[in-house]
């Protein structure tokens, strides 16, 4: 589905940021990028929707080079959920959720119908929430709306950059359960960045552990736990609660 082929990123000022990344993300997979601060995990994710461009190598989606995609089309087909919830403050919940379908020219009545279905699925009563503004929502409710906005138009790829790290433990656990349920239902190829190994182990089909712009180990949670590639993997699993 997504292939990184000898991908590197070098900054003239700070030097190498990513070094010769070569791996694939399978269609329908929940793929987690994890590592310490400065490891390059968020940069690796942002290459997929070309918020950042690599300096060497190729990235392909379903065999097509990213550079050959129309940029607007690529981003409309890629859902994106951030830690800082980017709901438009002057737009209602209904308007926020409908933003991408509207940009894609989808039927408004069908979008509203699907919005109601998705709100119900995530435990938010449509009649109570559709006309609310973001200022009237809790942090967990805002993140639920952000997730719905990202998936309502059936993106090929869902990118999630530490989406739950600012939430309290209860809300965080609830949203982890929710995104796992949505992923299993809609079979979206999901690329998820976190610094929390507990979260990675709970969600991932495979984990890509990075350090200093390189892949240290890529495998299932059990493989990282039971067959660590080196001492760094052992320590990271232990210190981050994954052991």
Show the residue positions of the predicted features:
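Conserved ABC ATPase "signature" region
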Residues: 109-128, 181
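Conserved ABC ATPase signature
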Residues: 132-137, 141
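Conserved catalytic motifs of ABC-family nucleotide-binding domains
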Residues: 154
């Amino acid at each position: 589905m997504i292939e990184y082929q000898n991908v590197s990123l070098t900054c003239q000022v700070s030097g190498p940021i990513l070094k010769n990344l070569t791996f694939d993300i399978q269609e329908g997979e929940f793929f987690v990028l994890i590592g310490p601060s400065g490891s390059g995990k968020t940069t690796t994710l942002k290459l997929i929707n070309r918020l950042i461009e690599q300096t060497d190598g190729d990235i392909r989606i379903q065999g097509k080079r990213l550079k050959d995609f129309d940029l607007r089309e690529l981003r409309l087909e890629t859902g994106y959920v951030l830690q800082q919830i980017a709901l438009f403050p002057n737009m209602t919940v209904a308007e926020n959720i409908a933003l991408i379908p509207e940009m894609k020219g989808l039927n408004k009545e069908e979008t509203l119908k699907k919005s109601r279905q998705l709100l119900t699925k995530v435990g938010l009563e449509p009649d109570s929430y559709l006309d609310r503004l973001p200022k009237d929502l809790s942090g967990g409710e805002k993140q639920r709306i952000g997730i719905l906005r990202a998936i309502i138009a059936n993106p090929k790829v869902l990118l999630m950059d530490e989406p739950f790290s600012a939430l309290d433990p209860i809300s965080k656990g609830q949203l982890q359960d929710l995104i796992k349920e949505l992923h299993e239902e809609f079979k979206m190829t999901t690329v998820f960045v976190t610094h929390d190994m507990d979260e990675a182990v709970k969600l991932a089909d495979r984990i890509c552990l990075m350090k200093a712009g390189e892949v240290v180990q890529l495998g299932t949670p059990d493989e990282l736990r039971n067959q660590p590639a080196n001492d760094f993997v052992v320590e990271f699993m232990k210190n981050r609660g994954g052991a």
